[in-house]
Regions:
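Accessory alpha-helical DNA-binding modules that contact the DNA backbone or grooves
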Residues: 25-33, 39-40, 48-277, 344, ...
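Loop/turn positions that initiate beta-strands
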Residues: 50-52, 593, 622
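ASCE P-loop NTPase helicase motor core
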Residues: 329-332, 337-511
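C-terminal accessory regions
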Residues: 502, 610, 621-736
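Conserved helicase motor core of P-loop NTPases
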Residues: 351, 455-617
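Short aromatic-glycine-enriched beta-strand elements
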Residues: 19-30, 633-639
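Pre-P-loop entry segment of helicase/translocase ATPase cores
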Residues: 156, 215, 225-226, 270-330
Length: 736
């Protein structure tokens, strides 16, 4: 198509039919005058009702939606008259301004309103009902919206995600475009989570050469940061060199020169482990070094055995109403004197009994204990089984956002340590090396640390595998629980978990217990079986309501994966209609009443207790909630997380995903009354023994595996764990 074939239309946005915050695509109804409203489609980031557009494009006819104007270029025309400005502001385009306040503002400033908001926002306080602080916030919101929108349009020209523009603007502010022209690879800041391929293409479009040192250095840092997500704390230097050279299509010598530059700038740390030269990001190197030092110091610290320990043990046992086995008594006694203690064991081996016993004994010793776990669900479960308050590690450390940088920081550290004599952490297999580093810094020297977990479950999502490394190092006091108690032996869930962990096939034929297998011949049969279990069989025949059932799958993709199952289960358990409001985001439609999950830590989301008793900040990866309401005018969605509720701006919906079904990895640290495991074909990396073992141990009363017996067998046989490059074990053993 030539420029002569393009047309130009001008009009006012009358309605927003659809908008995708991820890529900026929108479908608009635009009033072009003469009582004519047309449909305009294209990349139009953050449109607002009442906004005027000058659009260049072409007409087309959609098979389902009819005639529409496809936008290729657009110019936003700020409203000029007082009436147009009133309509524009009344659309709630700026948070803090509704129809009533818009009328008062426009009445006061007339056609100069937008100039005042942009250049002299403090003058808004001249309007009744607007405080100086609110005036400042309105000005910031307006400038940010204009800046983000301009950046989105700039990014759209270079095929960069619109959502990335929002995060980038928050980080770099009004100077973003100038900064990116100077160095496009600023987009590779880890906090932006930008795809390297898209950023690299963008940089080349701006004139960066293939062997530009900025590009090569960015490629090296990308490789290291990318491998953090695979669990690695470092990479061997030869592997890092080759991987970067292949990524960028440059010579290895060019990469080696860039590595030396990064080393001299302290952006990399070189180390030797087992005779191999390796490269760390500084934060990972410092974390391993500090953890090693603190744990070995704690291991060398033993506290005197309290007087009358036997009497205290009996008193603790009586208080908790429990009788200890020999292994359990050994663990509890060790907890009375050890500076650091590891307690490990599978399901049914009595870890909960030990936790209760330790708390009773340490209480008898007049020691203050704090309990923590990696996720909110794990912390809630810890509270339930011990009867004591427990929090997430992030909340224990008082995670907060540093205003100047926008980065997450912990307010509890070596300068503001925890006020506790003993810190007890459960579900340690989920804790990565960076989080453990932060935790140890907040524990004063001379205090006690008790770490409880099961290293045979899946390793942490983040870098390292500190709990597994600690146990395998044999350098720290450790109690291994191996005895399965008689009551636990009655549970096929427990016994099959141990069978799988030992490489034996689970019993799939027993139909009179808490563990069932339902074979399926096709993915469609699997999907229908799961639907029937959730809607009819479990609620009606076993009195287990749908909200107490969790679907798990090793995979995200495919008909048996979580993405497809979530769409199926939403349509079944929470269908459209009945006045329920919705919001499309990406490929998913969020609907009032949906079960959703927070998928990344966000330390500045404000929440409040549902009873209004408290307000706080921070929602964390793995938190599960229900969408209570969707407000299209305020562009917010309210989600209730058990006893708390939080409002999400529509631009934050990338932090949520449906949770009718979730991956086994996401379920770690949780326990559900009933678990249905979708077991079909998939990657050997995902269909592993540790994935199956972790899935089985998520069920409290009932586990149903739906799918192929061959897949269950393959998972049981696949004992391979993805290798993680981590130096903690060697450091603890003194082999560095």
């Amino acid at each position: 198509m030539t420029e002569q074939d393009l047309e130009i239309i001008q009009g006012t946005i009358a309605a927003i039919v659809y908008q995708n915050y991820d890529n900026g695509y929108a479908v608009l109804r635009v009033d072009v005058g003469a009582k004519q409203v047309v449909t305009v489609v294209g990349t139009i980031p953050l449109p607002a009702v009442g906004e005027r557009l000058l659009v260049t494009g072409k007409w087309s006819t959609h098979a389902s939606y009819g005639r529409q104007f496809e936008a290729e270029f657009l110019e936003r025309l700020m409203p000029q008259t007082a009436m147009d400005i009133l309509n524009y502001l009344s659309s709630r385009i700026i948070k803090g301004i509704g129809p009533k306040s818009a009328a008062r503002i426009v009445e006061h400033f007339g056609d100069q309103t937008l100039i005042v908001i942009e250049r002299e926002p403090e003058r808004l306080a001249e309007v009744s009902g607007i405080s100086p602080n609110r005036a400042r916030i309105i000005g910031e919101e307006f400038r940010q919206r204009v800046g983000v929108r301009q950046l989105m349009e700039f990014f759209a020209l270079h095929q960069l995600p619109a959502e990335l523009a929002i995060r980038t603007y928050k980080l770099y502010g009004e100077s973003t475009t100038d900064l990116l022209y100077d160095d496009p690879y600023l987009l590779m800041d880890p906090g932006l989570d930008a795809p390297f391929g898209a950023v690299d293409r963008f940089a080349i479009e701006l004139g960066v050469s293939a062997d530009d040192p900025r590009r090569v250095r960015a490629g090296i840092l990308f490789e290291l940061n990318y491998n953090l997500s695979a669990g690695h704390s470092f990479l061997p230097e030869d592997k890092l060199t080759v991987a970067t050279a292949q990524l960028l299509s440059v010579e290895t010598e060019t990469v080696k020169e860039a590595i030396e530059h990064l080393l001299s700038a302290r952006q990399l740390i070189r180390n030797t482990l087992a005779g191999i030269t390796v490269d760390y990001l500084p934060a990972l190197y410092e974390a391993e070094e500090y953890i090693t030092q603190r744990l070995l110091q704690s291991a060398a610290t033993t506290f005197p055995e309290p007087k009358h320990l036997n009497r205290l043990m009996k008193s603790a046992a009586k208080q908790s109403g429990l009788e200890y086995s020999q292994q359990q008594e050994q663990a509890i006694r060790a907890g009375a004197t050890a500076g650091v203690l590891l307690v490990t064991g599978g399901p049914g081996t009595g870890k909960t009994t030990i936790l209760k016993g330790l708390l009773s004994l340490l209480g008898e010793m007049q020691l203050k204990c704090v309990l923590a776990a990696p996720t909110g669900r794990a912390a809630k479960r810890l509270t339930e089984v011990t009867g004591e308050d427990a929090s997430t590690i992030h909340r224990l450390l008082e995670a907060s956002i540093e205003p100047a940088s926008g980065e997450m920081v912990f307010l509890r550290d070596e300068n503001n340590p925890l006020k506790a004599d003993v810190v007890i952490v459960d579900e340690m297999s989920m804790v990565d090396v960076l989080l453990l580093h932060s935790l140890l810094k907040a524990i004063p020297m001379g205090k006690r640390l008790i770490l409880v977990g099961d290293p045979d479950q899946l390793p942490p999502v983040g870098p390292g595998f500190p709990f597994g490394d600690m146990i395998r190092s044999e350098a720290l006091p450790t109690v291994r629980l191996t005895e399965i108690f008689r009551q636990a032996q009655q549970s096929l869930i427990v016994m099959n978990a141990h069978r799988v962990n030992n490489g034996e096939l689970p019993d799939l034929k027993n139909v009179k217990s808490d563990f069932f297998f339902l074979p399926c011949r096709s993915e469609e049969e699997l999907r229908q079986t799961i639907t029937g279990l959730c809607t009819t069989r479990l609620p009606q025949k076993m009195n287990i309501p749908a909200d107490q059932i969790q679907i798990l799958s090793p995979t995200r993709k495919g008909g048996a994966g979580t993405e497809s199952l979530n769409q199926l289960l939403q349509s079944t358990l929470n269908p459209a209609g009945g006045g329920k409001r919705e919001r499309q985001f990406g490929d998913y439609v969020f609907r009032e009443g949906d079960r959703v999950m927070q998928i990344r830590n966000n330390y500045d989301i404000v929440w409040k207790k549902c009873d209004g008793s408290a307000v706080g900040t921070g929602m964390f990866n793995g938190d599960i909630g229900i969408i209570r309401s969707i407000d299209p005018h305020m562009e917010t969605m309210t989600v209730v997380f058990e006893d708390r509720e939080a409002d999400y701006d529509f631009t934050q919906l990338n932090e949520l995903e449906p949770a009718y079904a979730m991956t086994v990895h996401k379920s770690q640290g949780s326990e559900y009354r009933a678990v249905i495991l979708s077991c079909w074909n998939g990657s050997p990396y995902l269909l592993s023994r540790s994935v199956l073992y972790t899935a089985i141990t998520r069920a409290r009363e009932l586990l149903i595996i739906v799918g192929r017996a061959e897949t269950v067998a393959a998972m049981t046989e696949n004992a391979k764990r993805g290798r993680r490059y981590t130096g903690l074990k060697l450091r603890l053993q003194g082999k560095v």
